[in-house]
Amino acid sequence: MKPNAETDNKVVFEEYATLVKEKYATLEFKGVDINHLADSIGNTITQDMPADMLFNKLAIITNRFRDGHSPLIGVYASGNFENIATFDLYAGYPVGFNDTILQNSYTGASIAPNLKRIAIDDQGTSVEVLYGFLPQSATIAYIRIPSFNVTIEDSQLESIFTKIKNATACILDVRGNGGGAPSLSTKIASYFMSQTTYTGFERFKIGPGANDFQDGPSNVTPANSDNRFTQPVVVLTDRGCYSATTTLCYNMNPLTQVTFMGQRTGGGSGSVANGWQWSLSTSEFIDHLGNHLDDGINPDIQVIFDNTDQNQDEVLDEALLYLQ
């Protein structure tokens, strides 16, 4: 998209830099000196600079966030996307799981008759929530939730936890779950709690100043159910665990019976004068130990998935072995 005729390139750049300075919540944690960065880039902005070059200049700031929630989007006049600058969650990290291997060797209907399946729509794509028992163990329960961008009814949650309540342990597999509704992920976490749990606090950016923040403590109440599961749990994570999935991990992290295994998890909108759209994270999570979660949560036990072995999921196998 070409900037509006009356819009100066420097005005667009300075507007975006000011929005970041006044609204973005984690500049200090990310080590971004927005004033220095804006000054150094701003000196290279010219009025005759093409739109794509100007976009790339703004994207330098965007990419410094290391934040998949805060993209910059350039659009055509028709409204179609032209350029998107956002953080690549997977850059520098190995693959965390392979869905084909998972289905062929562990969860497929033909080999896992003791796994129940709930087909749910995820924005036009059908996904399956799995729960029950894998063929590898009749006593260790397995729950697979590939997305929180879905609706799981309370009655369905009760069915899941009724099915597994007599298991000796549980594997909760959320690898590749890019998030969705934090209310759903929090509700699922509450099924693993025996008492109200302080999980940390959310820090909200409430003003333009560098220190204009307000903290909101987070306490999660156990699910009102007779089927809560308080036996040992392993949560399988990878870099694709983002947004509401990190919220799930954040809420389960204080629970002493929970172990995280696999890889590190992944962690207000409007537009600038020429129509490019922005999104900026206006809050950050800090866990019960004071750790910032925007860069993700490290597993208790790191396990690297070997994508060259088409018959084995090393992460899932390690979880089964750990819980035996």
Regions found by a protein language model. Name each.
Residues 1-170, 174-190, 194-203, 232, ...:
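Flexible, low-complexity junctional segments that flank or bridge functional domains
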Residues 170, 242, 256-269:
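Short, well-structured beta-strand/strand-turn elements
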Residues 176-182, 240-242, 266-268:
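Acidic, metal-coordinating catalytic cores used for nucleic-acid/nucleotide bond scission
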Residues 179-232, 271, 275, 286-288, ...:
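Gly/Ser/Thr-rich loop/hinge elements
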Residues 261-299:
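BRCT (BRCA1 C-terminal) domain core and associated BRCT-interaction motifs
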Residues 299-324:
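Low-complexity, Gly/Ser/Thr/Pro-rich intrinsically disordered linker/tail segments
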